């Protein structure tokens, strides 16, 4: 191929200075000193580096020239004129043959190279365009600088040309015709499959706890059917409260078995040494010191009394009274017979209308007698017969 020959032609001038340098460093065949040998090697190294950079610049120049020729040919095929800044450059670079070995090697892809993807090709062409524009501005500073805008304009022309070649006839046919009204909507498609189940939602706020206040009672329901009789329960204890409520309105007092001298032991002659046998506390009240019996409820009362007396000092009779509020209500008098014993009893009773807070008592009339307070012979009591008759 032509490429290796060019490489040999370029590398031959580099070999001659290397031989001349080696002869100069030898100093007519004499052995060189260590310092001069190092300087010669350093010089040869820089010279080789400069030559390699020149070769690289030349290769880039040739590649840029071939690329510009291809773009110029594409513009001529599209029928567009070149930019003013690139006309002189393209004419000056037109002397190189695009079919030369170096141009074909640098500008065209090798047959073994695999085609790139569309995105990769666009990136590669953009990087090549930027590199080529920089080289053109470097080698031709007198002409109008190339910019990326011109390269984009060229690429847009290429794309528009290719699109016009593919869709041009169809678009030309449609020119001049008005678009018709849109057609009716098509039938709806079949429903798609159900989507996946979504995540569970956030739990709600717990409710306020209710109150335990009891509501108003409802209306009474209808009575149910009568149930069977139950078993007989055990006998209960007597109800003291019921017994007390049903207790009869009576009081009975009796003596405590003592012997009393009226003159020495009684104050005012009223008997007070009583022992309660029965008494309804809701109707009667006993005053132990004074010996008086107080009535708590208005009504009609039956009052009775008996006293056993012992005669002394030749007294031939005995007498006592039943007083109500210190006023005589009943009186009993008994005389002694000649040749009889000195003991004797006297009994009296009567019915009286009494008001609440009135007091009953037994009062001795004569002071020269003694009283035998035996529980069987001396007693005093009252019975409430009922309400007082209306007057």
UniProtKB/Swiss-Prot annotation:
<feature type="region of interest" description="Disordered">
    <location>
        <begin position="73"/>
        <end position="127"/>
    </location>
</feature>
<keyword id="KW-0221">Differentiation</keyword>
<keyword id="KW-0812">Transmembrane</keyword>
<dbReference type="GO" id="GO:0005615">
    <property type="term" value="C:extracellular space"/>
</dbReference>
<dbReference type="GO" id="GO:0030154">
    <property type="term" value="P:cell differentiation"/>
</dbReference>
<feature type="domain" description="THD">
    <location>
        <begin position="249"/>
        <end position="385"/>
    </location>
</feature>
<dbReference type="GO" id="GO:1901222">
    <property type="term" value="P:regulation of non-canonical NF-kappaB signal transduction"/>
</dbReference>
<dbReference type="GO" id="GO:0060789">
    <property type="term" value="P:hair follicle placode formation"/>
</dbReference>
<dbReference type="GO" id="GO:0060662">
    <property type="term" value="P:salivary gland cavitation"/>
</dbReference>
<feature type="disulfide bond">
    <location>
        <begin position="332"/>
        <end position="346"/>
    </location>
</feature>
<keyword id="KW-0217">Developmental protein</keyword>
<keyword id="KW-0202">Cytokine</keyword>
<keyword id="KW-1133">Transmembrane helix</keyword>
<feature type="topological domain" description="Cytoplasmic">
    <location>
        <begin position="1"/>
        <end position="41"/>
    </location>
</feature>
<dbReference type="GO" id="GO:0005125">
    <property type="term" value="F:cytokine activity"/>
</dbReference>
<dbReference type="GO" id="GO:0061153">
    <property type="term" value="P:trachea gland development"/>
</dbReference>
<dbReference type="GO" id="GO:1901224">
    <property type="term" value="P:positive regulation of non-canonical NF-kappaB signal transduction"/>
</dbReference>
<dbReference type="Pfam" id="PF00229">
    <property type="entry name" value="TNF"/>
</dbReference>
<dbReference type="GO" id="GO:0045177">
    <property type="term" value="C:apical part of cell"/>
</dbReference>
<dbReference type="GO" id="GO:0005789">
    <property type="term" value="C:endoplasmic reticulum membrane"/>
</dbReference>
<dbReference type="GO" id="GO:0016020">
    <property type="term" value="C:membrane"/>
</dbReference>
<dbReference type="GO" id="GO:0010467">
    <property type="term" value="P:gene expression"/>
</dbReference>
<feature type="topological domain" description="Extracellular">
    <location>
        <begin position="63"/>
        <end position="391"/>
    </location>
</feature>
<dbReference type="GO" id="GO:0005581">
    <property type="term" value="C:collagen trimer"/>
</dbReference>
<feature type="compositionally biased region" description="Pro residues">
    <location>
        <begin position="216"/>
        <end position="228"/>
    </location>
</feature>
<dbReference type="GO" id="GO:0007160">
    <property type="term" value="P:cell-matrix adhesion"/>
</dbReference>
<keyword id="KW-0038">Ectodermal dysplasia</keyword>
<comment type="subunit">
    <text>Homotrimer. The homotrimers may then dimerize and form higher-order oligomers.</text>
</comment>
<dbReference type="InterPro" id="IPR008983">
    <property type="entry name" value="Tumour_necrosis_fac-like_dom"/>
</dbReference>
<keyword id="KW-0225">Disease variant</keyword>
<keyword id="KW-1003">Cell membrane</keyword>
<comment type="similarity">
    <text>Belongs to the tumor necrosis factor family.</text>
</comment>
<keyword id="KW-0964">Secreted</keyword>
<dbReference type="GO" id="GO:0005811">
    <property type="term" value="C:lipid droplet"/>
</dbReference>
<keyword id="KW-0176">Collagen</keyword>
<dbReference type="GO" id="GO:0005886">
    <property type="term" value="C:plasma membrane"/>
</dbReference>
<dbReference type="GO" id="GO:0005856">
    <property type="term" value="C:cytoskeleton"/>
</dbReference>
<dbReference type="GO" id="GO:0005164">
    <property type="term" value="F:tumor necrosis factor receptor binding"/>
</dbReference>
<dbReference type="GO" id="GO:0006955">
    <property type="term" value="P:immune response"/>
</dbReference>
<keyword id="KW-0472">Membrane</keyword>
<feature type="site" description="Cleavage; by furin">
    <location>
        <begin position="159"/>
        <end position="160"/>
    </location>
</feature>
<feature type="glycosylation site" description="N-linked (GlcNAc...) asparagine">
    <location>
        <position position="372"/>
    </location>
</feature>
